[in-house]
Design a protein with these regions (language model features):
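The feature marks helicase ATPase cores and/or their adjacent C-terminal helical subdomains
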Residues: 1-591
Length: 591
């Protein structure tokens, strides 16, 4: 794509004078156009600010990078950050501080808080219930979402028992939710609930309206299709205060239904914006075959045309038929080599992490089952590997940090179960940033190569015992012995077998949203998820033209590819996928 000149429709987005929605296909240069608009609008506003919001830190970092030397646009009164950070800083913090006379402590997820898990009486061998399985109304009432209950929660009888006791579970979840709010521990979910509550409360509206009206002249929303009920309520409130709303997105890339993001709500909101809608329909990323594959998955009517250098690449989509997951990587590498790509150019994508890991030959470490020694060993492998993505590295560091923090808090007095990670660090006297550095250093320093599980466990305990803890109280040898025991042989064998790392990088589809790669290997596993309501799989949805999130996930995955798209399809589904591609005119070859 030309690095200097915007297309006509991109320029229209930059120059729009009313609140509006711009629909952008994959690779349409939306970030480039949004940053151009952001720079233009910040230069025009003398007193009020312009906010540019997205939904991931990676997307925000990319916006900041593209602002280049224009660093003043990243300073007050302007704002570039995630929508969650916007909610925290400009809505929840001022309101919570006023109501509770203390500052809130934000945590990313409920599972970062020990007391966010709970049990009902007579649950037997079932796992703990988690607040993440519930939706919360603005008044704090919980609603159990059956589809969020993991399959390994318990057998059919256990699941049936939970559903029979649904009201009791919801009441308990509401109680814990309220206790956490009172304690000042606010997850992203809780912050969105509180924001919605205060925006519909007369007193809250009276406080927030002048604050937001005087601060922001315009809010630009990237990946607008990911807006849920709460985000749309906030945008409506801002619009009512006279703030201009610019939304850019692709409703076919809406894959966050677990946080109440639904394309229909976004379309309805966008349809009521006064400005003329704009379509960015030129794909500057992918080949014609990949664009055709994308169109076969798209539910909306936005056209998509290959442009730029890759528009001249006539490589077809490649289908791999496999019976066993270990057949995928060798076949993909052969195809890549034939197309002048290397393993470093590829990424293996799957909807569920376990399917991608299995195809890549990686044994997962389940944070709910594995002991701390296994987590630390596995984290070291992840951090030393050249093929792990940032999300996997972040997850690995989190596992180690929480393991270390457990050692520092085990001897503390009761009453810490409602505290989040940062609050726990403050209680025991360690800086969270120091703890992160310590966790990385420990995981990388301790190598499993040639060591038994007992030897490695002893090295972990020694590392912690001899560490310099500064103002924090060092953990006792007894505590270290109880917390850091060697895993059993089968777990250790699984950890050690992954020490060399996978041949191809892998990730979930959600982990690469907004990114692009020369080659993508998309895995359709043998056991496809069956929707609890429709009883259909993603292949059923694709064949039948049903508009579902599972289908949109495949669309997001395929549209990351620039030059080569490989679909690894289990033998059970290969003929059905071929029929779909034939019917939709997708150029492909089967190997």
């Amino acid at each position: 794509m030309n690095d200097l000149r915007l297309t006509e429709n991109q320029q229209a987005l930059v120059d729009a004078e009313e609140s509006m929605f711009a629909a952008a296909c994959p690779g349409a240069g939306k970030t480039r156009a949004m940053v151009a608009r952001f720079l233009k609008r910040t230069a025009e506003e003398e007193r009020r600010g312009v906010a540019l919001l997205s939904f991931t830190n990676a997307a925000v970092d990319e916006v900041r990078r593209r602002c280049g030397e224009h660093t003043r646009v990243l300073e007050v009164p302007h704002f570039v950050g995630t929508f969650d950070t916007f909610i925290h800083r400009f809505i929840v913090t001022p309101m919570y501080t006023t109501a509770y006379r203390k500052k809130p402590n934000y945590v990313q997820r409920w599972r970062d808080v020990p007391s966010a898990n709970f049990r009902l009486s007579r649950m037997g061998q079932a796992k703990d219930l988690q607040l993440d399985w519930f939706d919360f109304a603005p008044d704090g009432r919980a609603r159990l979402i059956e589809s969020r209950i993991p399959r390994d929660f318990g057998n059919d009888a256990v699941r049936a028992d939970l559903l029979e006791r649904k009201r009791a579970a919801e009441e308990y979840a509401s109680h814990i939710f309220g206790r956490l709010i009172d304690a000042g521990t606010i997850s992203c979910v809780a912050a969105r609930c509180l924001a919605e509550y205060w925006l519909q409360d007369a007193q809250g509206e009276q406080i927030l309206a002048p604050l937001l009206r005087s601060r922001f002249a315009e809010v630009i929303v990237d990946e607008a299709q990911d807006c849920g009920r709460e985000e749309l309520r906030i945008l409506q409130f801002l619009k009512q205060q006279g703030t201009r709303i610019i939304m850019v997105g692709d409703t076919d890339q809406s894959i966050y239904e677990f946080r109440s993001a639904t394309p229909d709500r976004v379309r309805m909101f966008a349809d009521n914006l006064p400005g003329r809608p704009i379509e960015l329909k030129d794909n500057w990323r992918s080949t014609p075959a990949i664009c055709a594959f994308n169109r076969s998955l798209r539910c909306g009517q936005l056209p998509e045309t290959a442009r730029g250098d890759n528009s001249l690449n006539l490589t077809p989509v490649h289908l791999i038929e496999y019976r066993s997951p270990d057949q995928i990587v060798p076949a993909a590498l052969d195809i890549a080599e034939h197309n002048k790509l290397t393993a470093d150019d590829l990424i293996l994508l799957s909807h569920a992490e376990k399917h991608g890991m299995k195809a890549a030959g990686v044994h997962g470490v389940d944070s709910g089952k594995q002991n701390r020694i296994a987590r630390i060993a596995s984290a070291g492998h992840v951090l030393r590997s050249r093929t792990t993505d940032p999300r996997a590295r972040r997850k690995a560091v989190d596992h180690v940090q929480h393991s270390v923090l457990a050692a520092l808090t085990i001897d503390e007095k009761p009453g810490m179960e409602h505290l989040g990670f940062d609050a726990l660090c403050e209680r025991v006297g360690v800086d969270p940033r120091w703890l992160e550095t310590f966790a990385v250093r420990m995981a990388i320093s301790l190598d499993t190569h040639g060591k038994t599980r007992d030897v490695f466990a002893a090295e972990v305990r020694a590392f912690l015992r001899t560490a310099e803890w500064g103002n924090a109280k060092a953990p006792s040898s007894g505590s270290l012995g109880r917390l850091f025991r060697a895993p059993n042989e089968s777990v250790w064998d699984g950890v050690v077998s992954t020490s060399t790392g996978p041949a191809i990088a892998f990730s979930t589809v959600h982990g690469v949203k907004g990114k692009e790669y020369p080659g993508v290997v998309l895995v359709l596993p043998e056991r496809l998820r069956v929707d609890d309501v429709t009883t259909r799989t993603v292949v059923d949805d694709w064949e039948g033209g049903h508009h579902t999130e599972a289908r949109r996930v495949l669309y997001v995955a395929a549209s990351r590819a620039q030059q080569l798209l490989i679909c690894a399809i289990h033998k059970k589904y290969i003929s059905r996928i071929e029929a779909v591609l034939d019917n939709t005119g997708v150029p492909y070859t089967r190997v």
